[in-house]
A protein has these predicted regions:
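Periplasmic/extracellular loop-to-transmembrane helix junction in inner-membrane transport proteins
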Residues: 81-124, 144, 292-303
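Cytoplasmic-entry segments and transmembrane alpha-helices of multi-pass inner-membrane transporters
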Residues: 131-170, 208
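Transmembrane alpha-helices
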Residues: 208, 217, 231-269
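Interhelical loop and adjacent transmembrane-helix boundary motif
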Residues: 266-311
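Membrane-interfacial helix termini and adjacent extracytoplasmic/periplasmic loops
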Residues: 90-108, 166-200, 269-272
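Flexible loop/hinge segments at secondary-structure junctions
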Residues: 1-91
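Hydrophobic transmembrane alpha-helices
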Residues: 154-161, 174, 194-205, 255-262, ...
Length: 311
C-alpha cells in the first residue's frame, strides 16, 4: 500500500518479513543514490549507461526497492513493479496523513481533514447557538418595535457580506488577538476558524429563529400571562416549544453554512493537514482542502479521485 511504501523509504520498515515476505533486509535505492554505486566513467557521458547500471543493480541486489523513472529499467521483465496509483478504503478513512505530493507514495488519509472539520464546526456551533438564540429571544419578545426595526435589517445585511471579507476580518483582528491572548507562536488556529464561522452563521440563526418565534399566536402568550406566568416563563414554556421546528431549521441552516464554508476558513486556520490535539492548533477542513488543491490535481489521477471522494 502507499503507506507501506512510505514507511519503507522512511526506514520505518526495514525487513521484508514485516510485510509478510522472506526474512531479508530491505535496501532502498533512489536515483540520486546511483553515484554511491558507480563512478561517472561507468555511467558514461550524460549518464548514458545509467539505465543499464540501475537494471544491473536491481537484478543483482536481493531485497532492493528502487524508486526511479521507468525509462531507466532496461529489462522490465526482470523486475517487479509496485503499483501505488490505487487508494484503498482503509488507507483513506483510517490514514493519519494527507500528503498528496509525497514521493515515492502519495498519502491520502482523510482523518486529519475530517477531524479538523469537526473541531471547527463543533466549536462554531457552541459559540453561535447560545448567542444566536439569545438575540432571537430579545428581538422577538423583549425589544420594542423601534429597536427591532433598526436591528433586524443590520443582521440581515450581515448575511450578504462575502466570506472573504469575514476572512480578512478574522486575519486582521481575531488571529492576532488569539495569538496574544494564549501566547501562541501563530494565531492561525481552529479557534480562529470557529469564531469566524460562528459570526458568519449568526445572521441565519437569528433571522430564521426570530421569525419562528414571532409566529407564535398572541393568544397563547396572553393565556400564559393570564394564568400567572412571568414573561420569561412564557418564553420558556410557551413560545420556544411552539417555535421549536423553526428554531431547529435556523440552527440547521447555520450549521450547514459553518460546515460548508471555504474561503474564510482557508484564511484563518493555518491549513496544516495534521490531526489537531487542541482547538488552538492550526488545522485544515475538507472544503478548504478541495478549494486549495482541486485546481492543481491532474484530472483522473489518484489526487483528483481522493478530492472527489472527500467532497
Amino acid at each position: 500500500s502507499p503507506a507501506q511504501i512510505k514507511n519503507v523509504f522512511d526506514e520505518e520498515i526495514t525487513n521484508w518479513k514485516e510485510l509478510g515476505g522472506e526474512d531479508l533486509p530491505i535496501r532502498v535505492f533512489r536515483l540520486e543514490d546511483i553515484t554511491q554505486y558507480y563512478t561517472e566513467e561507468e555511467l558514461g557521458p550524460a549518464y548514458e549507461y545509467a539505465g543499464d547500471k540501475i537494471t544491473e543493480l536491481v537484478e543483482k541486489t536481493p531485497g532492493i526497492v528502487a524508486f526511479v523513472p521507468q525509462k531507466f529499467i532496461v529489462h522490465p521483465d526482470a523486475v517487479h513493479f509496485i503499483e501505488d496509483n490505487t487508494i484503498s478504503v482503509k488507507d483513506v478513512f483510517a490514514g493519519a496523513e494527507w500528503f498528496p505530493t509525497a514521493t515515492p507514495a502519495a498519502q491520502f488519509g482523510f482523518l486529519p481533514l475530517i477531524t479538523g472539520t469537526l473541531w471547527v464546526s463543533l466549536f462554531a456551533i457552541l459559540f453561535a447557538l447560545p448567542f444566536g438564540l439569545s438575540v432571537s429571544i430579545y428581538m422577538s419578545e423583549v425589544a420594542n418595535p423601534k429597536v427591532r426595526n433598526w436591528l433586524k435589517p443590520i443582521i440581515e445585511l450581515l448575511s450578504g457580506i462575502p466570506s472573504v471579507v469575514y476572512g480578512f476580518f478574522g486575519l486582521i483582528v481575531i488571529v492576532p488577538l488569539i495569538q496574544k491572548l494564549f501566547d501562541l507562536p501563530v494565531g492561525e488556529s481552529g479557534l480562529a476558524g470557529s469564531i469566524v464561522l460562528a459570526i458568519m452563521a449568526l445572521p441565519t440563526i437569528i433571522t430564521v429563529t426570530e421569525d419562528a418565534m414571532r409566529n407564535c399566536p398572541r393568544a397563547m402568550r396572553e393565556a400564559s400571562l393570564a394564568l400567572g406566568a412571568s414573561q420569561w416563563q412564557t418564553i420558556y414554556k410557551v413560545v420556544i416549544p411552539y417555535s421549536i421546528s423553526g428554531i431547529t431549521s435556523g440552527v440547521v441552516l447555520g450549521i450547514g453554512r459553518a460546515i460548508g464554508e471555504t474561503m474564510a476558513v482557508l484564511m484563518v486556520t493555518g491549513n496544516a493537514a495534521v490531526i489537531p490535539t487542541t482547538i488552538l492548533e492550526p488545522l485544515r477542513t475538507i472544503p478548504a482542502t478541495i478549494a486549495a488543491e482541486l485546481g492543481e490535481a491532474p484530472a483522473g489521477g489518484p489526487h483528483y479521485q481522493a478530492l472527489f471522494l472527500l467532497g
